[in-house]
Amino acid sequence: MKEGSVMTEILAIDDDRGILEVIRRALSREGYHVTTLDDPQKLDESQLPRYQLILLDVMMPGMDGFQLCRKIRDRVDCPILFLTAKTDEKDLMEGLGIGGDDYITKPFGIGELRARVSAHIRRENRERKHNAV
């Protein structure tokens, strides 16, 4: 969150609570405020506009990350990054085709997670600054 004084809000959704805790700790140390959900059904869609970035696990029981992305993409303009163990080109193309902005392959390193999140946040901040001029 080195780009400004307003705390950047990130939403992470994954059915694995251990991964959510790793994400929360890693990104909180960078100054981000991270909200975690272990079930996409618990998402309060009225809160979506507050997030500047969303991390979505692809493979979750009930509603998977692709289904959730399709459901919310037209209501959010922030980056959506998929977390997945799926590495097929078909899955990658599907995720990007439905509105995902990037993929982070599991298992992922903390450095990669922080770098990708930071890069997307920086780009969003540049676009907002440019559009405000």
Which residues does each predicted region cover?
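Conserved acidic segment of CheY-like receiver
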Residues: 7-18, 23-27, 54
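Short, Lys/Arg-enriched segments at the junction into DNA-binding effector domains
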Residues: 9, 119-133
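Active-site residues of response regulator receiver
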Residues: 14, 57, 84
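The feature encodes the CheY-like receiver
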Residues: 20, 61, 88, 106
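Acidic, metal-coordinating helix/loop segments flanking the phosphotransfer/catalytic sites
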Residues: 36-53
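Acidic catalytic/metal-coordinating carboxylates
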Residues: 38-39, 64-67
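C-terminal output helix
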Residues: 108-121
